[in-house]
Each structure stands twice: as C-alpha cells, then as structure tokens.
Amino acid sequence: MKLTKLALCTLFGLGVSIANAADLPNITILATGGTIAGSGQSSVNSAYKAGQLSIDTLIEAVPEMKNIANIKGEQIVKIGSQDMNDEVWLKLAKAINAQCKSTDGFVITHGTDTMEETAYFLDLTVKCEKPVVLVGAMRPATEKSADGPLNLYNAVVVAADKKSSGRGVLVAMNNEVLGARDVTKTSTTAVQTFHSPNYGSLGYIHNSKVDYERSPESKHTINTPFNVEKLDSLPKVGIIYAYSNAPVEPLNALLNAGYQGIVSAGVGNGNVNAAHLDRLEKAAKDSVVVVRSSRVPTGYTTRDAEVDDSKYGFVASGTLNPQKARVLLQLALTQTKDPKVIQQYFEDF
C-alpha cells in the first residue's frame, strides 16, 4: 500500500542541500519491521499490521535521506517487536560487528514495544564505536499523521553525525536522542512515548542537526566483556511480577523449567512478599542468580536496604528496570554465575 502524501509532507522544507555522494557518509539501515513498517486499511484508523513494508519501500518514501548519506538497506526480519527474540538480537549484533569497518553508521528500524530491550542488548554487545541508532514509529506508515518518515530521516541525521560516535547505542524518536541504558517506553499510544526518566535525553534533533547535551556515563559497546560472536543462544532468564498476595506458582514454574536467572519486578524498592522471598532465597542457594528490580518507573533498587542482598546472595539492579535487568543478566550468565561479579556488572553497565 502506498504511503500517504501527508505522512511525507512532514519532510518538506527541511532545506538540506544535495551533496556529492562521494562526500557523504555511508549509512546502513537494518530493518526488523514494527509499526514504522506497518500498514492499515484506513488512513484515519489506528488498526494496522506491523512489519508489512520492506526496507526498500521505507527508503523510497524518504528520498531526502539521500541528501545527507549514502543509504544501504538490509532486511533482517519483518516482525512486530512483541515477537523480538534472542535469535534476532544475536543476528543484529553480529551484523553490526561484521560491517563496522565498511560503513560509517547504522540505523535499525524497530517496533517500539521492545525497542528499549534491543537497544540495551546491542549497547552491551556491539564492538563498534560508530553510531548505532534505533528508530521506530507510534503510527503506521499509512496513517495520515504518521511519525515514521521524519523519525527515520532524523535517525539517519544522528547516524551520519560524527558527534554520535562513542556514545553507545542510541534511540532517535520524536526529535530526541536517548541513551540505550536509560530509555523506556512510557505511553501505549502517544507519539512522545520514549523518555529517560532517571537521567534525561542525550540531545535533540532540529533542522537536520543534532545538539548533544551529555554522554552516557556507564560503560558500553567496546568496554564490556560480552562477546556474542560464538553464541547461538542465550541463558534462560525470566521475570516475576510482584503484587499484593502474589502466589509463588509462577516463580516455581520458571525454576522447574530450568531457568538460570530470575529477575523480580518488585514493589517499591524491589520488595517481595515473604513467600517469594523464601523461594528466591532457596533458588539462590541452588545457584540460580536472583536480581531484584522494581515495577516502579523511576529511582534505584537499593542494595541491602529493606532486603539484605548480601545475606541472601541477591543482586540489586540499581536504575535498570526489570526488562533491562533481564537483558544484562542473560549476558552476565555467559560469563559467570557469581552474584558478586554480576553485582559489579550492574554497577558498571
């Protein structure tokens, strides 16, 4: 289905001069599907199917990108990001590592549902200092007010800017640049859904330029110990959600299924009820790594506060939310099962 003219009109008037292709940076776009490649039957209805449009179609819809970079597209998968999995994560990381020397930057088109998890996984596993920028959309390409075309254009602006190098993996959405470790989706429907609630944005995109205000302080990319080149799978780590009167059966199901790590999405400062605490203590004694996080959207999960992590052998997630704590724990388990070493990973990365 053709993209609506209104969706593309948002790019008019950007005023980017046409440059000689030989003088432009080379940017590789790795496409995975998502709403940015979504298609619906109506331009005024939010019903659509994700991942329908090819990377070639997305590139053709935003010809202005060719004024700022030489664009090459590669279709990795065509899925909604609710179906994102370890296999695709590994494929993306390996593709970026393999092509790092032959391109000046990468853009990854991705669904917004799990974008923050993919971004953080790549932040920990990509061994390349060149820009890696994830981008998506909250409205499908066929909707009248589609945000995807301008988001994609801006992502290329970010990837083509040398100032983006060395900042870790980035997310470019709605004129903002956000760091992979801190960014999270905050609204199910709003265009301005991505925020970094603990630390704020890294910078902003305006009139085809990036204005950076800060860089991430945590270690990333080339400064992590995680090498995925020989991996074809990741350790099994599950998340258990805490709430009033929460039963232990879901936790038992994961442990009985052989999960090597458990992340607790606790209440408040990562707290769980007495039954959960008892079961998690037993799991830790059986060499299952337990990480305490919180379902609360901002703040720290503090080590040795209400829960004596040192006594139980638990790991505290700091400012990582449960879904990102799971990502780091999966990678940590490829290196060690020592909770003291893993605690240091959570403080460093």
UniProtKB/Swiss-Prot annotation:
UniProt xrefs under SMART domains: Asparaginase (SM00870)
Gene Ontology CC terms, in alphabetical order: periplasmic space
EC category name: hydrolase
Keyword Disulfide bond: yes
Span of the signal peptide: 1-21
Catalytic activity: L-asparagine + H2O = L-aspartate + NH4(+)
An MF annotation (GO) of this entry: asparaginase activity
EC number: 3.5.1.1
InterPro entries for this protein: AsnASE_II (IPR004550), Asp/glu_Ase-like_sf (IPR036152), Asparaginase/glutaminase-like (IPR006034), Asparaginase/glutaminase_AS1 (IPR020827), Asparaginase/glutaminase_AS2 (IPR027475), Asparaginase_C (IPR040919), L-asparaginase_C (IPR027473), L-asparaginase_N (IPR027474)
Occurrences of domain Asparaginase/glutaminase (ranges): 25-349
Main location (coarse class): periplasm
Biological process (GO), any one: asparagine catabolic process
Positions of disulphide bridges: C100-C128
Residues reported in the UniProt entry to bind substrate: S81, T112, D113
Subcellular location(s) per record: Periplasm
Top-level lineage group: Bacteria
Keywords attached to this entry: Disulfide bond, Hydrolase, Periplasm, Signal
Sequence similarity: Belongs to the asparaginase 1 family.
This protein's name: Probable L-asparaginase periplasmic
Organism: Haemophilus influenzae (strain ATCC 51907 / DSM 11121 / KW20 / Rd)
